[in-house]
């Protein structure tokens, strides 16, 4: 009884006092059975947990890593550190408004005293909802926003920001150079439409031209059109073009993007140039590109860092194109990882022949292509890789490359021998590099494995598209269902941006059928677009023989045998009620409030958007 009372006091104290103080009290008080029970931080059942929270497990005895494991919502999680009786986990940015279960298997930890496996357990907590807000700045060439240029908006972003600073860029062609400073983390640059929101400039880095202030006064000594010198930069829904390479379809070096800091993310973006389109930074930098388009001809993704190119399109501009020129230091573990990418011609229908995955720029490069599809315009050299530049690769390999018909591409002739120096017959150094990955090796190179680091970075959370709201109207008011992870909503009219709002309704004008809504996550990622709005009133749906009618207060179903199940769902997605009905017997729903009625019978299932 005494221990249960103490536990209640501790759980209350955890909400009010710093973790370190409570941890000391727990250990000093020896409240739990030695080596068997783990205090949980967050406490079991705790609500409103910050999404950047650490998870701390404790024991009254010292802990050491055991043979078994811990899992967070079914995903393996390792402790970032173990000291004394405390194990600290850093899961990275968690999802908002989400319930998590931490499972500690028996034997995940051992007693430091006698190496005895300690008993584990499980507990749950729920993260907080996001703070409602709209974008911090809007860029519009017509003067309708806060700034008329992207450069102005980025220069005005605050220093040392710990939360995302959201910049929304309206459609337009912005001919300028954009740089972030190293003191401006967490800038999120989001375009209205990637096809119509374009940042472009003509600049070359050849011979130090970018440092010529008379030629390029806004370059600040850096050659790319867009430079992310700050950590946690996010590029979404924007096209970036270096016209020097793209317009001329020739070199020399002309960068569209330089990402020179850690935790760079790009989603649904476009990069275009010819030579050296994207420079990825140093060994310690991590980069994530998702569903983006990258175009070039010569070494157009190059430099270092652990980088994942996830479901991207790689476009080749000429015959004999070379995709990557990595320069990874010996300590880089994964290098460039391309997963589920498509390789195409920059001009569909124009063949690109005798192309190469890459060549070793410097040091000990690593590059893996996994589940890559080649369009009918693309032909790779049988060697796959160029054997000489300035480095000696550790891994230049691939797994499951297929042609446009879905047939496996032969890897039998892929190059494995590499050399440095000026004479192939008398090389300075040589190496044999891995050219083919096993399925197990390929499966292991996931986004989380390659990029999580010691801070648990989850860039795929950044790029999460929130689901489309359910949109409906009554009289001259537009309504939509709330999304728990949304900070705001973008309202579109006839396909164009209209406004941002933190509300879930607004008064509309004109033809209601032209309105659409999408939810926005905390990083500014634009979610899936809603269907057209529907009117509250008589709704009729059929599925096979099943026919369902709702007149605003009563529901009637026909065309089935036995009984049908009626499930009602509220605006927040929760179930508002469940009933069983017989054929042609009206169900009076009285004052029940719901937005979706799902009717399931032996002849089919109907879903009505019936607002109450």
List PLM regions with ranges.
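Short beta-strand elements bearing conserved aromatic residues within extracellular beta-rich modules
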Residues: 68-70, 489-491, 566
């Amino acid at each position: 009884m005494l221990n249960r009372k103490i536990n209640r006091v501790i759980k209350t104290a955890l909400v009010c006092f710093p973790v370190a103080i409570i941890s000391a009290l727990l250990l000093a008080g020896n409240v739990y059975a030695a080596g068997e029970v783990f205090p949980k931080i967050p406490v079991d059942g705790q609500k409103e947990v910050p999404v950047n929270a650490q998870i701390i497990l404790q024991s009254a005895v010292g802990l050491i890593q055991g043979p078994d494991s811990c899992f967070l919502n079914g995903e393996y999680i390792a402790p970032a550190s173990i000291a004394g009786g405390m194990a600290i986990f850093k899961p990275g940015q968690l999802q908002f408004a989400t319930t998590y279960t931490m499972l500690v298997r028996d034997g995940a930890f051992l007693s430091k005293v006698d190496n005895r496996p300690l008993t584990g357990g499980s507990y749950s907590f729920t993260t907080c909802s996001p703070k409602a807000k709209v974008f911090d700045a809007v860029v519009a060439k017509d003067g309708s926003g806060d700034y008329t240029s992207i450069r102005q908006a980025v220069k005005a972003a605050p220093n040392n920001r710990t939360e995302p600073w959201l910049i929304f860029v309206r459609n337009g062609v912005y001919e300028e150079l954009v740089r972030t400073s190293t003191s401006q983390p967490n800038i999120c640059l989001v375009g209205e439409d990637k096809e119509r929101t374009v940042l472009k400039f003509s600049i070359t880095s050849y011979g130090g031209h970018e440092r010529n202030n008379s030629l390029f006064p806004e370059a600040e000594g850096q050659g790319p059109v867009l430079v992310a010198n700050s950590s946690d930069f996010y590029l979404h829904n924007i096209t970036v073009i270096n016209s020097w390479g793209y317009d001329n379809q020739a070199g020399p070096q002309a960068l569209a993007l330089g990402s020179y800091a850690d935790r760079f993310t790009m989603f649904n973006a476009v990069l275009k140039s010819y030579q050296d389109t994207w420079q990825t930074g140093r060994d310690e930098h991590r980069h994530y590109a998702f569903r983006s388009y990258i175009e070039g001809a010569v070494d157009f993704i190059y430099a270092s860092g652990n980088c994942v190119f996830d479901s991207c399109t790689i476009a080749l501009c000429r015959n004999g194109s070379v995709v990557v020129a990595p320069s990874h230091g010996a300590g880089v573990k994964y290098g460039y990882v391309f997963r589920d990418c498509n390789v195409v011609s920059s001009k569909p229908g124009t063949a690109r022949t005798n192309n190469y995955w890459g060549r070793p720029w410097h040091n000990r490069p690593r590059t893996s292509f996994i589940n890559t599809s080649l369009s009918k315009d693309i032909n790779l050299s049988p060697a796959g890789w160029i054997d000489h530049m300035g480095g000696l690769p550790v891994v230049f390999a691939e797994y499951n490359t297929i042609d446009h018909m879905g047939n496996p591409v032969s890897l039998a002739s892929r190059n494995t021998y590499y050399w440095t120096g000026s004479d192939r017959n008398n090389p300075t150094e040589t190496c044999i590099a891995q050219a083919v990955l096993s399925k197990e090796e390929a499966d292991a190179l996931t986004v989380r494995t390659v990029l999580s680091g010691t801070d648990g970075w989850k860039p795929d959370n950044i790029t999460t598209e929130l689901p489309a709201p359910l949109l409906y109207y009554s009289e001259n008011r537009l309504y939509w269902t709330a999304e728990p992870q949304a900070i705001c909503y973008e309202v579109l009219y006839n396909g164009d941006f209209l406004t941002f709002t933190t509300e879930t309704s607004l008064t509309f004008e004109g033809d209601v059928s032209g309105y659409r809504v999408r939810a926005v996550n905390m990083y500014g990622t634009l979610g899936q677009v809603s269907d057209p709005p529907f009117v509250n009133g008589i709704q009729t749906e059929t599925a096979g023989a099943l026919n369902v009618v709702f007149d605003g207060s009563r529901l009637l179903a026909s065309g089935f045998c036995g009984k049908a199940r009626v499930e009602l769902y509220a605006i927040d997605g929760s179930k508002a009620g469940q009933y069983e009905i017989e054929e042609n017997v009206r169900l009076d729903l009285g004052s029940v409030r719901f937005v979706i009625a799902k009717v399931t019978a032996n002849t089919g299932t109907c879903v009505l958007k019936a607002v109450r």
